């Protein structure tokens, strides 16, 4: 019998560094605290264990997920890994980002937590994604530069 799996989307922050015209987020300064994450993950993992569900994929999104520091994600990774191991649940993490906050300081975390993979997206033609006070063309140039840096 195949292992049953659940997917969970977690928003580490609602903040964003872009000004996309179609965005529905309120850009509140709220961030997911480690204490809140610990409670949430405990409840999710307890439920999975009670239902004999052995695998959880966590999709980290936002706002913009990379506006939370790599250190925060390191702490979150350790907390989640330990809690999941105690309950026999396999965990996989995925990161969705606009890449605008990417720097090489993210590389160790991306390797450790996200399997050297980041999800991103592009609009073509880009009519609505932009940085505050800038054009969509400026956003595209910045995104392409960050994409090359992340390779």
Residue positions per predicted region:
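Radical SAM/AdoMet-radical enzyme domain recognition
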Residues: 42-46, 50-59, 68-151
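N-terminal binding-site loop/beta-alpha segment at the start of enzyme catalytic domains
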Residues: 39
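Canonical Radical SAM [4Fe-4S] cluster-binding loop centered on the CxxxCxxC motif
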Residues: 2-36
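Active-site neighborhood of divalent metal-dependent phosphoester/pyrophosphate hydrolases
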Residues: 63-64
């Amino acid at each position: 019998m195949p292992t049953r799996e659940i997917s969970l989307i977690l928003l580490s922050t609602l903040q964003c560094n872009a000004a996309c015209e179609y965005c529905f987020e309120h850009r509140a300064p709220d961030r997911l605290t480690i204490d809140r994450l610990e409670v949430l993950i405990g409840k999710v993992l307890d439920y999975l264990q009670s239902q004999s569900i052995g695998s959880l994929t966590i999709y980290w999104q936002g706002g913009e997920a990379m506006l939370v520091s790599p250190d925060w994600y390191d702490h979150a990774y350790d907390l989640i890994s330990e809690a999941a191991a105690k309950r026999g649940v396999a965990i996989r993490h995925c990161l969705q980002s606009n890449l605008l906050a990417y720097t090489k300081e993210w590389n160790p975390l991306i390797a450790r937590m996200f399997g050297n993979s980041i999800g991103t997206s592009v609009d073509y033609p880009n009519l609505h994604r932009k940085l505050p006070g800038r054009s969509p063309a400026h956003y595209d140039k910045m995104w392409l530069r960050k994409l090359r840096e992340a390779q």
